[in-house]
């Protein structure tokens, strides 16, 4: 294999603790408890090793990263090592004192999530009463601090009708960028798929709404749009390709090529407590497993898109078929594409209740998926 370029970004999942209980959370079903989280000095070492490896962007996430009192200290170290710093937050713990500490540390950017523009529905989705007013205050604090305001709305069948109002609210808050992200069905999102998966008609209306707003707000607000795979003909690239541009560190120190990768139960992921980042990136077997194109089965191997979508998502392939090697079922050419079609067909007219993201609330698997025959 040719020389491995360093990862552009590192996602530091500082904790799985979070005041919210969103049913589409990308955290694993088995949430890691506070007692096994990396200590401050371990995260500081990771900041140093990331800089030496060539990482340019340091993203702090969770759970809710502001649960960690050492967050400003970690940001300051990343800034000292000349990495761009970004926090991905619910905003419910961001007050004046924390904002002052973050600015003193040198934070570059904060991405603020919203569950809906409708207060009652937003707080039903997030499972936290009073959250919306705290989020609005957080947006104001970010703007007053002089930072660019990026908002994230996760959309699904139970809030999609409010998309026009979400975009209006984003503009009113002074957002320079808004991400409209359809739920990605991994982890808790997969558990809640029937409660979240929109109809094709809902998706088409949402897509048209985004396209109209992009044209109308050109030069005012950038709108990113992430579509669901279930109505796609081609898969999305896995983080720009498995272990090509991105590395994720879990709260306990597992190093992952993407935030959902530990769902791949057949792979053993290294710990930063035992490996250096450089050794993980260049030599860990789990990182080599799906890097590049040599691993690809047909039809990926001979497809002219093989270095565009990189075979799609390994986590989705495994979650839906029990086979992590198979072409992503999102691809119309995948032997497992019917699994996607069947999921859409099975979608009920009435959304079931959410299974909320919290420790001890994950459903117990009642069957083991068998690989889909080619």
Curated annotation (Swiss-Prot):
This is PqqA peptide cyclase. Residues 4-224 form the Radical SAM core domain. Binds 1 [4Fe-4S] cluster. The cluster is coordinated with 3 cysteines and an exchangeable S-adenosyl-L-methionine. It comes from the Bacteria. SMART domains: Elp3 (SM00729). InterPro entries: 4Fe4S-binding_SPASM_dom, Aldolase_TIM, Elp3/MiaA/NifB-like_rSAM, MoaA_NifB_PqqE_Fe-S-bd_CS, PQQ_synth_PqqE_bac, PqqE-like, Radical_SAM_PqqE_MftC-like, rSAM. Its EC number is 1.21.98.4. The gene is pqqE. Interacts with PqqD. The interaction is necessary for activity of PqqE. Pathway: Cofactor biosynthesis; pyrroloquinoline quinone biosynthesis. Belongs to the radical SAM superfamily. PqqE family. PANTHER family: PQQA PEPTIDE CYCLASE, RADICAL SAM DOMAIN PROTEIN.
